[in-house]
A protein has these predicted regions:
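Juxtamembrane helix-break-helix junctions at the cytosolic face
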Residues: 58-72, 92-93
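Non-cytosolic membrane-interface motifs at loop->transmembrane helix junctions
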Residues: 33-43, 72-73, 97-107
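Membrane-helix boundary elements
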Residues: 3-9, 13-44
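Short, Lys/Arg-rich, polar N-terminal cytosolic tail immediately upstream
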Residues: 1-5, 129-132
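Core segments of alpha-helical transmembrane spans in multipass integral membrane proteins
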Residues: 15-23, 41-64, 76-86
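Membrane-helix boundary connector in multi-pass membrane proteins
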Residues: 65, 86-103
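Hydrophobic alpha-helical segments of small multi-pass membrane proteins
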Residues: 74-88, 104-115
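Membrane-water interface at the C-terminal end of transmembrane alpha helices
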Residues: 110-133
Length: 133
């Protein structure tokens, strides 16, 4: 496999989103307090996206298990990163957003770029494989 970096990328992405999701699922109030940000009026507004991060983390581990075969899932991961980055950067530029959200936006932007590179690398690898479908 030429794209040896893809498997570790998705393992890291799985741990990153999984740990972040579990943190916001288990101790959301403490995280908001640490950043001195008022939490939403109901924890479900935080826990639902936290659980989505855990689901995506599982998907990233599945991609890591067989990146070429599960290449189509990379697009869903890229979609997740766009869904977070777009509003975060939009509000950071146009109005205001608590600074606690911006380090994760920059991380997700980095993951988005790497996911795009992985998508193309896996496509080339699949095309070169004699067993490709």
């Amino acid at each position: 496999m030429r794209s040896k970096w893809v498997r570790p990328l998705f393992i890291i992405a799985g741990f990153y989103d999984g740990i972040l999701g579990l943190a916001f699922l288990i101790v959301p109030v403490q995280i908001f307090a640490m950043y001195q940000v008022t939490p939403p009026n109901h924890l479900a507004y935080i826990q639902f996206p936290a659980l989505l991060l855990v689901v995506f983390a599982i998907m990233f581990f599945r991609i890591a298990a067989d990146p070429v075969r599960r290449r189509e899932l990379v697009l869903y991961g890229a979609g997740l990163k766009i869904a977070y980055c777009a509003p975060a950067f939009f509000y950071d530029i146009t109005t205001e957003i608590p600074s606690m959200w911006m380090p994760w936006a920059w991380m997700d932007l980095a993951f988005l770029v790497l996911f795009a590179l992985a998508w193309f690398a896996l496509g080339r690898e699949a095309a070169a494989s004699p067993t490709s479908r």
